[in-house]
Amino acid sequence: MRGVSKPQLAALFATLTAWWERFRRVPMVQHWGRELAAVGAILVVLAAPFLLKPAEGSAPREYNRRLVIYTPHHEKIRYEFGRAFAKKWKDERGETLYVDWRVAGTSEIALMMRSDYAAAFERYWTESLNHPWLPEVATSFGNSKVALPKPGEKAGLTVQQSARKEFLDSAVGIGVDLFFGGGAVDYESQARAGFLVAADASGQFGLKPVMKKHPEWFQPQSIPQSLGGESYYDKEARWVGTCLSSLGICFNRDVLARLGIEKEPVQWQDLGDPRYFGQVALADPNKSGTVTKAFEQLIQQQMQQAIDERRDDPNAEGDPEKLGIEIGWERGVHLIQRISANSRYFTDNATKIPLEVSQGDAAAGMCIDFYGWTFEDMVRRPDGTSRMGYITPLGGTSMGVDPIGMLRGAPEPEVAAAFMEFVLSDAGQKLWNFSPGTAGGPVRTPLRRLPVRLDFYNAANRASMTDPHADPMETSRAFTYHPEWTNHLFGVVRYLVKVMCVDTHEDQRRAWEMLISRNFPPRATAVFEDTRLLNYQNAQELAALLQKKDKIQEARKATELSVAFRNQYRRAYQLAKDGF
């Protein structure tokens, strides 16, 4: 049990044994021994959680203020930032602050926020405004597509418009102050819904006042509004990036040597090499936004390469960008198919990928940079070498941000604003990448995250960093994310991997293994790689289908496509087996 030492457990067991020896000598106990023993066992089970509870909880016994934060961040980040900010608040304000972390994945947090805001606004709508709660209100208050009249227009409001306007004008809250960690896409969605705000009702506290107080932080040389096609902060000041991250490949050098692969992977297409069969660790994109983002960026890299090829070809006809996007999409889908065919299985959590690679259960996999670096450190040998490695595919990934934003109706807007200011300050930025034990660094373990402020990367700071050679600018220059190419197809990427790879994985792997053993006979290979059902045009139609949010139609289409690919893989297997 956490918080209870072995001597304490031994003493507890000895005491209970002595009590039992005395108790069982009582005449009534000797007569009803079995029944009383059963009752006693039940009581012990019920009392154990209280007897063996940790000596200390995460909350202080007494506190003056409480800051509630939704976050997907792991315990190391929560500990370092919670500890450092609470100390700063105590030193400056003389108050004990309790940082109350509410931990879940970003998709779960999104569901909780929508559900909680719906319940909170329903109370406000029915009790404060005395309006009936209607289905139109429930679906409109947080819907950014509900258009409101422009200032000066006198047109009457519909029920949907009234609900939307009242919500945006309100200070309805859910008892949570901040959303900290995740991806910019998640924050853009919450900001559009109206759940994230630039300032509280008074206008005194929030990110907007912080930006006004520190304009030097929000300059191109520090935190640019966008870089490499990725937004670094919201133009309406509802969220801002706090640290940087990119996607890449983690790999195990020992496993590569066992497989006879001398060259370490450096690009996404390396994971499609047949020599990696059964040795790639992947997560299900339908349960991992990280892997979906990696696949999207893989596709964009193929698009950019196809566009460049057509622009450099003097005989190429048509619009290079339009045709390049379509060709690149097809190439990207083929590469995803090969990487999937090489995978052992699809795990349900992206964090398991570097764990499996570090343990030697897989040769390589896709992961976020800081997970790759962390596991590389965990298995580092005394001589400084490590069987684990991580590489960012240059030109194949962007440098995105992990943001923070204040929620509408935050109970402690002053503390929330101070926390955001702290995270962006020199003190907060040092926590992300300074080595433990250095001045301003974390006290327990390195966080291995890259600070968002580009002005942070100077010689003085690099001397204390765990990743002194990191260069966010180089990564950003090598890859430009074009949201207009694939942003609207993000859900389609998840969908196509499900029907083409996850649901059909057994048949896909079986066919791929046979193709490898027969040295890829042309006819069988062509059948295996036939992805016309998921070409760029059909992807647009799938996007329209997913936009309707009709689960029955989605399931029906998924079944249709899964059956088609399963039959296709079985046919490819048989053709390859027969040498065709």
Task: Cite the ranges covered by each PLM segment.
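Early extracytoplasmic/lumenal segment of secretory-pathway proteins
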Residues: 34-35, 49-189, 354
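Short loop->beta-strand "edge-of-pocket" segments that line small-molecule binding or catalytic clefts
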Residues: 68, 269-290, 298-302, 320-324
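A structural signal for short loop-to-beta-strand junctions that line the ligand-binding cleft
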Residues: 151-180, 192-250, 269, 391-395
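Ligand-binding pocket segment of bilobal, Venus flytrap-like solute-binding proteins
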Residues: 293-384, 430-431
